Amino acid sequence: NSPGAIITLLVNKIDYQLSQIAQIIESNDAKILSLYSENLESNNQIKLTIKISDSKLGAVLQTFSRYDYTVQDVFSDDEISNQGKQRYDHLMKYLNV
């Protein structure tokens, strides 16, 4: 039960390159903690469930988007919820001015 974020990707079988996915994650100073792949026969895709260190989740997600990967789900307690809280706090400060 190590801390981290879980990302679920959908990748076409013909486009699947684990080395590129690992490079995207590691180039954003995150580490792959575990990976599970599932073959989806119905739509010729592979579903990847990747647990990464939570250090730079936002940067990893932006890079996946830039490389046209389909991010199906993201599960994290820290960065995304903290970002939402920070935006809420900024809004409250603005409204108090």
Regions found by a protein language model. Give the residues of each.
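A conserved regulatory-domain signal marking ACT and ACT-like small-molecule sensing domains
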Residues: 1-97
